[in-house]
């Protein structure tokens, strides 16, 4: 029996749970949240649609109620308590695989501490960047000539530059085939904004990313609703435009639909891959 825990049953955690429901794995799943209302919503969402007879779900409020060993843990809380939760989890439970939601942590020192914890406890860890699982990005990846530089740009209004840049950087790194990059934050506007998530902050401006082979990524976030979502990718003779909200991409002027997968469609696939 595959043993899974989802810690944090809010908006995103409940979607992870829905995604796990699609898995064919015979599994016991523990959903952890100290807020009983969140657990109730997660349960309601899980119970929508057909029953998965391969799964048994437990809704609990404390990490101490988890079993001694888990094959996979998804930590889907907000970033502020995440390190504390990770420490509490690994102090009690032997974990094989962990998926961490971004933004990972709120302090620079937290990253080193978390890395040490994961290494000491021999845990495999991933940050959830789901675009790698979108079929059309895999199609684009097959078109890219990794021997030639990739030029990628993404611009939109109020898209959460701090919180969401990791998604664009991750898919850029996949497409470029590179393992390292340098980020230039000199284009950030030095004015703090309130994030859509209460208690967090954001910035507008430009982030420039470059790799050793000459590939570049330019991320632009502005407080101007007239600026609309657009991603462009240039590599060799290819000129690709992607518009995720409208569900299409254009390759050298040839427009075609693309399918954007939700988290509720993905986590089960990831769980099976980690098996």
What is the predicted role of each segment?
Residues 213-274:
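NAD(P)-dinucleotide binding in Rossmann-like oxidoreductases
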Residues 14, 18-22, 44, 87, ...:
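Short, well-ordered alpha-helices that flank and scaffold nucleotide-derived cofactor binding pockets
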Residues 153-227:
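Rossmann-like dinucleotide-binding domain that binds NAD(P)(H)
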Residues 1-51:
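N-terminal Rossmann-like dinucleotide-binding module
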Residues 63-64, 72-75, 104-169:
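A contiguous active-site-proximal alpha/beta segment in oxidoreductase catalytic domains
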Residues 48, 54-117:
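Beta-loop-alpha module in the N-terminal Rossmann-like domain of NAD(P)-dependent dehydrogenases
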Residues 26, 93-97, 121-123:
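A short helix->loop->beta-strand "cap" motif at the edges of active sites that frequently abuts
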Residues 3-5, 28-30, 97, 126, ...:
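A structural signal for isolated positions on well-ordered beta-strands in alpha/beta enzyme cores
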